[in-house]
Curated annotation (Swiss-Prot):
GO cellular component: cytoplasm
GO biological process: protein refolding
Keyword flag Transcription: no
Location in or out of the cell: Cytoplasm
Physiological role: Together with its co-chaperonin GroES, plays an essential role in assisting protein folding. The GroEL-GroES system forms a nano-cage that allows encapsulation of the non-native substrate proteins and provides a physical environment optimized to promote and accelerate protein folding.
Region (Disordered): 526-546
UniProt protein name: Chaperonin GroEL 1
Gene transcribed to yield this protein: groEL1
NCBIfam families on file: GroEL (TIGR02348), PRK00013.1 (NF000592), PRK12849.1 (NF009487), PRK12850.1 (NF009488), PRK12851.1 (NF009489)
A Pfam family that the UniProt record links to this protein: Cpn60_TCP1
InterPro entries referenced in this protein's UniProt entry, alphabetically: Chaperonin_Cpn60_CS, Cpn60/GroEL, Cpn60/GroEL/TCP-1, GroEL-like_apical_dom_sf, GROEL-like_equatorial_sf, TCP-1-like_intermed_sf
SUPFAM superfamilies: GroEL apical domain-like, GroEL equatorial domain-like, GroEL-intermediate domain like
Enzyme class at the top of the EC tree: isomerase
Length: 546
């Protein structure tokens, strides 16, 4: 085991605070509408230009072990805030730096760090309650667009795209972000349920222009096993043919003579059918087949339910208004399922989301909810160069997270104003002793810091603006983009409550840990081993005349 360096007291804390400051100073230049860019080196390809706080934080790794510990702790603040709320990473970093900086002064003057932390926690809890009180619900398209625009660094086109996407697929719908092919942003909306399986044979295509198979008013047969024997399918095919409607078969696989017969019937125009593989794998496949059954008002033909293909009737088949099957995707539009059953299924899947332990499972379950409840929207980000595309895509993803957070917990005035208002409301708070009161003071000072930084990045005098905003009431604040004092909500400068709340809580949590640290253990740097001696001599006789 390598030898360790153990550092105590102020020496440990001061080194860690140096690391905190290095990271926070690099991150905080990006805050606000007039924040600057940070350029990140890449081991291959061109550098990345970003205004995203968490992207900057993640790149920072310091040479000094103790400084690096401090930097990594604050990096945790940014990552946690990004994971929970999707935005507010720079605000969280600025708050953490301020709490650490102010707190260190009190610790150095001999105050009890544990009491300081209790005071900090008390003030944060009161501030969070106050933020919840002043929060207002975010329901209209205009408000959603405003949140998206602010989060995407005052880019209103991104906010409008996100609001449009949410309007089309609902608040629960899946919205994904992809690289576009043109200079302009585009929005593709898939209504109904789409899953990533296409036709099993190109002979099923009946729309050569789009290279898709379109079925109008079809029946849907769902089966959880492979189908290779056409005899199994004959009874149900005859019933569908009599009804004179097309058929979509979704099974684990359709192969051999079964697939060949379906293709021949399709080409001859005897029976319009398309076969696709069932989506997902294992238990997830069963669950998704069940979802499709509920959406189309059918039943999965499975041994577990006592059904076999030979005994299947039209009553067991699902129905839809229209189904499009492409090379890689199948879209079911307007399934015939009962709304009550679909709602019950959505509730059931939501309950599973609450209990899910892994992020992957949670993401897949959320996709299922969206497919059942609304649809899928894809925002295709357009840009002139790849570097710009990456930067813009990151901003769109941030804005998307922020709008979801706003819909969830509501919005407050942006630009650091909400924290100033919450600060005024808790200014009279007192702790159990003088040290706790000092902890409360630390938080009250830190809550000014985001506004100070926004103003500083805009090139104005921070103290003057903070005093003017603090003297105002309600949503009155400073719009750094225009340099005017306005009603922030009316001007469209809003933040999701969840983002502001999470930033404050995470910043206080990590800063409190730093202040109460009294020893740090780090590996000693390895000394470089001396180079081995000169090159060994050549073989005897080399280069000699024989």
């Amino acid at each position: 085991m390598a030898a360790k360096d153990v550092v105590f007291g102020d020496s440990a804390r001061s080194k860690m605070v140096e690391g905190v400051n290095i990271l926070a100073n690099a991150v905080k230049v990006t805050l606000g509408p007039k924040g600057r860019n940070v350029v990140l080196e890449r081991s291959f390809g061109g550098p990345t230009v970003t205004k995203d706080g968490v992207s900057v934080a993640k790149e920072i790794e310091l040479k000094d072990k103790l400084q690096n510990m401090g930097a990594q702790m604050v990096k945790e603040v940014a990552s946690k805030t990004s994971d929970n709320a999707g935005d507010g990473t720079t605000t969280a970093t600025v708050l953490a730096q301020s709490i650490v900086r102010e707190g260190m002064k009190y610790v150095a003057s001999g105050m009890n760090p544990m009491d300081l932390k209790r005071g900090i926690d008390k003030a944060v809890a009161a501030a969070v309650e106050e933020l919840k009180k002043i929060s207002k619900p975010c329901t209209t398209n205009k408000e959603i667009a405003q949140v998206g625009s602010i989060s995407a660094n005052s880019d209103s086109s991104i906010g409008d795209r996100i609001a449009e996407a949410m309007d089309k697929v609902g608040k629960e719908g899946v919205i994904t972000v992809e690289d576009g092919k043109s200079l302009a942003d585009e929005l593709d909306v898939v209504e109904g349920m789409q899953f990533d399986r296409g036709y099993l044979s190109p002979y099923f295509i009946n729309n050569p222009d789009k290279q898709v198979a379109v079925l109008d008013n079809p029946f849907v047969l769902l089966h959880d096993k492979k189908v290779s024997n056409i005899r199994d399918l004959l009874p149900v095919l005859e019933q569908v043919a009599k009804a004179g409607r097309p058929l979509l078969i979704i099974a684990e696989d359709v192969e051999g003579e079964a697939l060949a017969t379906l293709v021949v019937n399709n080409i001859r125009g005897i029976l319009k059918t398309v076969a696709v593989k069932a989506p997902g794998f294992g238990d997830r496949r069963k669950a998704m087949l069940e979802d499709i059954a509920i959406l189309t008002g059918g039943q999965v033909v499975a041994e577990e339910t006592g059904l076999t293909l030979e005994k299947a009737t039209l009553a067991e088949l699902g129905q839809a208004k229209r189904i499009e099957v492409g090379k890689e995707n199948t879209t079911i539009i307007d399934g015939a399922g009962e709304a009550v059953n679909i709602e019950a299924r959505v509730k059931q899947v939501r309950a599973q989301i609450e209990e899910a332990t892994s992020d992957y499972d949670r993401e897949k379950l959320q996709e299922r909810v969206a497919k059942l409840a609304g649809g899928v929207a894809v925002i295709k980000v357009g840009a002139a160069t790849e570097v710009e595309m990456k930067e813009k895509k990151a901003r769109v993803e941030d804005a998307l997270h922020a709008t979801r957070a706003a819909v969830e917990e509501g919005i407050v005035a942006g630009g650091g104003v909400a924290l100033i208002r919450a600060r005024t409301a808790i200014a009279g708070l007192t702790g159990a002793n003088a040290d706790q009161n000092a902890g409360i003071k630390i938080v009250l000072r830190a809550m000014e810091e985001p506004l100070r930084q926004i103003v500083t990045n805009g090139g104005e005098e921070a103290s003057v603006v903070v005093a003017a905003v603090a003297a105002g009431k309600g949503n009155y604040g400073y719009n750094a983009a225009t340099g005017e004092y306005v009603d922030m909500v009316e001007a469209g400068v809003v933040d999701p409550t969840k983002v502001t709340r999470t930033a404050l809580q995470n910043a206080a949590s990590v800063a409190g840990l730093l202040l109460t640290t009294d020893a740090a253990v780090a590996e000693l740097p390895k000394e470089d081993a001396p180079m081995p001696g000169g090159m060994p001599g050549g073989m005897g006789g080399m280069g000699m005349d024989m």
